[in-house]
């Protein structure tokens, strides 16, 4: 059912639905065509709407990109937070947590991230707007890391540093996937880092014990 066929919706609801539709189309276009290949015409086509309908909600390509990145970072932050909670309650081991993060950093989330990062290098206005969004994203990640400390069994003085180092590793691996399609190579790197995490935190064993 398209938007015109959906009865009983208020104007704010229709507006929110259209914006969500355009944001989803923007993310899909960035992933498929890259930032340079993303245009208002291509986004409208992907969304199945007219250019006029698009311009009613967003004035420029970068307005759409910023809105799309904001949505992407919010959803990803929520996803990572849910994984962290699973480690806390013992339903997910720390190596399992690393596997979940790698799925994010080797998939669409990170590929889209690469597009807006490289675009920002030569687009000062876009960079200024995205810096604010990424700052909020990293603040949310810091809150997620600190949540590990709320459970006594998971407290460790170097845990926050280890987890931030983990993100740096995954970002680097994610960039490398662009030119190196070698799953076995990345699997070895992940296995090595899982040993590092176990050595520095001991969380894996404690999580298993709570599952018994």
Q: Where do the PLM segments sit?
A:
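N-terminal intrinsically disordered/low-complexity leader segments
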Residues: 1-17, 179, 204-212
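Helix-turn-helix
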Residues: 21, 25, 29-63, 67
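Solvent-exposed, amphipathic alpha-helical segments
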Residues: 21, 25-32, 79-83, 112, ...
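Hydrophobic alpha-helical connector segments
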Residues: 63, 67, 80-110, 156, ...
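Short, basic, alpha-helical segments at the C-terminal edge of helix-turn-helix-like DNA-binding modules
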Residues: 70-76
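Amphipathic alpha-helical packing segments from all-alpha helical-bundle domains
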Residues: 76-83, 103-114, 124-150, 161, ...
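Hydrophobic/aromatic-rich alpha-helical bundle segments in the mid-to-C-terminal region
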Residues: 125-131, 148-212
């Amino acid at each position: 059912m398209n938007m015109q066929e959906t009865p009983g919706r208020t104007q704010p609801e229709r507006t929110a639905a259209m914006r969500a539709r355009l944001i989803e189309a923007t993310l899909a276009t960035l992933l498929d065509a890259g930032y340079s290949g993303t245009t208002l015409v291509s986004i409208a086509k992907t969304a199945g709407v007219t250019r006029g309908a698009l311009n009613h909600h967003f004035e420029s390509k970068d307005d759409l990109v910023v809105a799309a990145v904001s949505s992407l970072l919010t959803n990803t932050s929520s996803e990572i937070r849910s994984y962290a909670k699973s480690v806390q309650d013992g339903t997910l081991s720390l190596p399992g947590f690393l596997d979940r993060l790698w799925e994010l950093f080797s998939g669409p989330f990170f590929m889209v991230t690469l597009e807006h990062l490289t675009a920002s290098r030569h687009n000062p206005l876009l960079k200024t707007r995205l810096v604010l969004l990424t700052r909020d994203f990293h603040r949310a990640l810091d809150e997620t890391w600190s949540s590990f400390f709320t459970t006594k069994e998971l407290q460790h003085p170097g845990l926050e540093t280890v987890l931030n180092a983990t993100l740096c590793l995954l970002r680097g691996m994610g960039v490398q996937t662009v030119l190196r399609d070698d799953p076995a190579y990345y699997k070895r790197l992940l296995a090595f880092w899982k040993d590092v995490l176990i050595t520095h935190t001991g969380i894996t064993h404690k999580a298993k014990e709570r599952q018994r």
